[in-house]
Curated annotation (Swiss-Prot):
Region described as Disordered: spans on this chain: 348-376
Annotated InterPro entries: Glypican, Glypican_CS
Record's protein name: Glypican-6
Organism of derivation: Pongo abelii (Sumatran orangutan)
GPI-anchor amidated serine: lipidated positions: S529
GO biological process: cell migration; regulation of neurotransmitter receptor localization to postsynaptic specialization membrane; regulation of signal transduction
Propeptide: 530-555
C-alpha cells in the first residue's frame, strides 16, 4: 500500500472513532429530551430537534448535546428551586412539630392560668362574699403577675409572691382588727412580720417553691419550643452557593443535555452533592441534639415535680388554707404585731360599729372538686408531654440526616440496587468516588461541590448560638433556676451580619439574673452594695502592695 494512502486513512479512522455512538450519519434525535423539557413547563423553542456540538456548555460535558446555552441556564435555575423545595419538604416534620406543639402548650398554659383565676374568684366569692370582692385586686394582681411572667415579663417570682403574702397580711390584719385604725406606716411594719410570725402557716413557703419551679419550667419549655420553631423555619430556607448550584445542575439536568432524561443520579453521587450543599446545616446538628436533650429533661420535670397543672389547679384551696390558718391564729398574730409595732389608734366609734358585723370570721368551706372547670385546652399536661417527648426524640440528628433522607427518595435517585444504570455526572455508569463524611470541614475533598471550609455560614452560626443560649436556659430550668440572658443583640433573630463565631471561639456577653433574690433587708441593699465595692477595691490594693513587696525581696 502506498504511504500516502495510510496517511489519509489513519486520520479518518481516528475521526470516526471520536464521534459519539449513533452519530455515523446524522446526530441523535432530541425528541425524548424535548418531551421531558416541555413537561417542566419550558418553551420547546429553546431546544433543538437533534444534538448539536457542546462547546458552549459551561457546566455539562462539552460533547454532542441537546442543550443550548439558554436551556443550561434555565435548568440550572430549576435545579436550585427544586433543591430549596426538597430541603423544605424534608424538614417539614420537624418544623410542624415545633409549630403545632408550641401552639398547644401555649394555649394550655394560658387557659390553665385563666381557669385557676376563675376558680379562685368563684370560690372566694362564694366563701367570703363582699369581704373578698372588696379586696379582690390583691388576688387579681397575683394572677396578672403570673401571666406577665409566663409571657416573658421581667418578674421576679419569689419577690412577687412575697409581696402577695405581705399585702394579704395587711388586708387581713385590718379585717380581723376592725376596732383599730392603721396608718400606711403601721401596715408596712405589719408586713415585715410575715416571715417571723408565719401567720399563714407553711403554705407560703411551700407554694413559693412549687409555683417558682413550675412556672420556670413551663415558661422555659415554651420558650424552647419557640426557639426550635424559629431555628427550624430559618434553617429549612436554604440559599445554595454558586458551587452548589453548579453541582445540582450537573447531577439533575446534565442527563437531559446528554439525551438521557430518564436516567437518575447514582445514590452515592447524590449523597456527595447534598453533603457539600448542606455542609453548614450538618454542623448545626451537635448543638441541635444538645438542645433536644435539654428539652426532654425539662419535659420530664413538667410531668413530674414541676407540674404546673398540679400546682395551679388547687391554688385556690391552698390560699384558703392559708387564710384559715391566719384566722385561727389571729389573736396571737395581733398580739405579737402590737408588741413589735406598737398599740394602734382606736378607730372612730361609727366606723368601728359599722365594721364589726363585717369582720373576717367566715370559716373556710371545702370546695367540691366536681365544681372545678374542665381541663385546660381540652387535654392534660401529661398527655401533652408524652406526645412532645416522642416528637422531640424523632427530631434528633435531623440536619445531618438531610442528605440521606433526600437521596433515598425514589424520585430523586436510581437507588442503591441500580448502581450500574445511573448518572454519575459524566455518563450512565457506576459512581466510583467515596462518600464524604458530614460537616463543613469534611468537604475539603468533596469531588462534586466546591466548598470553602474556611468560611462557615454566618447565618447558621447565629442559629447555633441561639440554640446554645436556649440549652443553657433549659438546663437551669431543669434545676429550678431562672436565668434571663440580657444580650445586646437578639439571641435568635438571625438578623444582621452576625459574629461568624465558631463553637466557643467568641465570648458570650450574657448577664445572668436569677429569681433567687438575696436575703437582704431592702433598706440595707445600697449600703451593702457600696460596702462590697469598697471591700473589693481594698482587697485589690492590698494584693498589689504584697506583689510589689515580693518582687523587691526577690531582687
Amino acid at each position: 500500500m502506498p504511504s500516502w494512502i495510510g496517511a489519509v486513512i489513519l486520520p479518518l479512522l481516528g475521526l470516526l472513532l471520536s464521534l459519539p455512538a449513533g452519530a455515523d450519519v446524522k446526530a441523535r434525535s432530541c425528541g425524548e429530551v424535548r418531551q421531558a423539557y416541555g413537561a417542566k413547563g419550558f418553551s420547546l423553542a429553546d431546544i433543538p430537534y437533534q444534538e448539536i456540538a457542546g462547546e458552549h456548555l459551561r457546566i455539562c460535558p462539552q460533547e454532542y448535546t441537546c442543550c443550548t446555552t439558554e436551556m443550561e441556564d434555565k435548568l440550572s435555575q430549576q435545579s436550585k428551586l427544586e433543591f430549596e423545595n426538597l430541603v423544605e419538604e424534608t424538614s417539614h416534620f420537624v418544623r410542624t412539630t415545633f409549630v403545632s406543639r408550641h401552639k398547644k402548650f401555649d394555649e394550655f398554659f394560658r387557659e390553665l392560668l385563666e381557669n385557676a383565676e376563675k376558680s379562685l374568684n368563684d370560690m372566694f366569692v362564694r366563701t367570703y362574699g363582699m369581704l373578698y370582692m372588696q379586696n379582690s385586686e390583691v388576688f387579681q394582681d397575683l394572677f396578672t403577675e403570673l401571666k406577665r411572667y409566663y409571657t416573658g415579663g421581667n418578674v421576679n417570682l419569689e419577690e412577687m409572691l412575697n409581696d402577695f403574702w405581705a399585702r394579704l397580711l395587711e388586708r387581713m390584719f385590718q379585717l380581723i382588727n376592725p376596732q383599730y385604725h392603721f396608718s400606711e406606716d403601721y401596715l408596712e411594719c405589719v408586713s415585715k412580720y410575715t416571715d417571723q410570725l408565719k401567720p399563714f402557716g407553711d403554705v407560703p413557703r411551700k407554694l413559693k417553691i412549687q409555683v417558682t419551679r413550675a412556672f420556670i419550667a413551663a415558661r422555659t419549655f415554651v420558650q424552647g419550643l419557640t426557639v426550635g420553631r424559629e431555628v427550624a423555619n430559618r434553617v429549612s430556607k436554604v440559599s445554595p452557593t454558586p458551587g452548589c448550584i453548579r453541582a445540582l445542575m450537573k447531577m439533575l439536568y446534565c442527563p437531559y443535555c446528554r439525551g438521557l432524561p430518564t436516567v437518575r443520579p447514582c445514590n452515592n453521587y447524590c449523597l456527595n452533592v447534598m453533603k457539600g450543599c448542606l455542609a453548614n446545616q450538618a454542623d448545626l446538628d451537635t448543638e441541635w441534639n444538645l438542645f433536644i436533650d435539654a428539652m426532654l429533661l425539662v419535659a420530664e420535670r413538667l410531668e413530674g415535680p414541676f407540674n404546673i397543672e398540679s400546682v395551679m389547679d388547687p391554688i385556690d384551696v391552698k390560699i384558703s388554707e392559708a387564710i384559715m390558718n391566719m384566722q385561727e391564729n389571729s389573736m396571737q398574730v395581733s398580739a405579737k404585731v402590737f408588741q413589735g409595732c406598737g398599740q394602734p389608734k382606736p378607730a372612730p366609734a361609727l366606723r368601728s360599729a359599722r365594721s364589726a358585723p363585717e369582720n373576717f370570721n367566715t370559716r373556710f368551706r371545702p370546695y367540691n372538686p366536681e365544681e372545678r372547670p374542665t381541663t385546660a385546652a381540652g387535654t392534660s399536661l401529661d398527655r401533652l408531654v408524652t406526645d412532645i417527648k416522642e416528637k422531640l426524640k424523632l427530631s434528633k440528628k435531623v440536619w445531618s440526616s438531610l442528605p440521606y433522607t433526600i437521596c433515598k427518595d425514589e424520585s430523586m435517585t436510581a437507588g442503591t440496587s441500580n448502581e450500574e444504570e445511573c448518572w454519575n455526572g459524566h455518563s450512565k455508569a457506576r459512581y466510583l468516588p467515596e462518600i464524604m463524611n458530614d460537616g463543613l470541614t469534611n468537604q475539603i475533598n468533596n469531588p462534586e461541590v466546591d466548598v470553602d471550609i474556611t468560611r462557615p455560614d454566618t447565618f447558621i452560626r447565629q442559629q447555633i448560638m441561639a440554640l446554645r443560649v436556649m440549652t443553657n436556659k433549659l438546663k437551669n430550668a431543669y434545676n429550678g433556676n431562672d436565668v434571663n440572658f440580657q444580650d445586646t443583640s437578639d439571641e435568635s433573630s438571625g438578623s444582621g451580619s452576625g459574629s461568624g463565631c465558631i463553637d466557643d471561639v467568641c465570648p458570650t456577653e450574657f448577664e445572668f439574673v436569677t429569681t433567687e433574690a438575696p436575703a437582704v433587708d431592702p433598706d440595707r441593699r445600697e449600703v451593702d452594695s457600696s460596702a462590697a465595692q469598697r471591700g473589693h477595691s481594698l482587697l485589690s490594693w492590698s494584693l498589689t502592695c504584697i506583689v510589689l513587696a515580693l518582687q523587691r525581696l526577690c531582687r
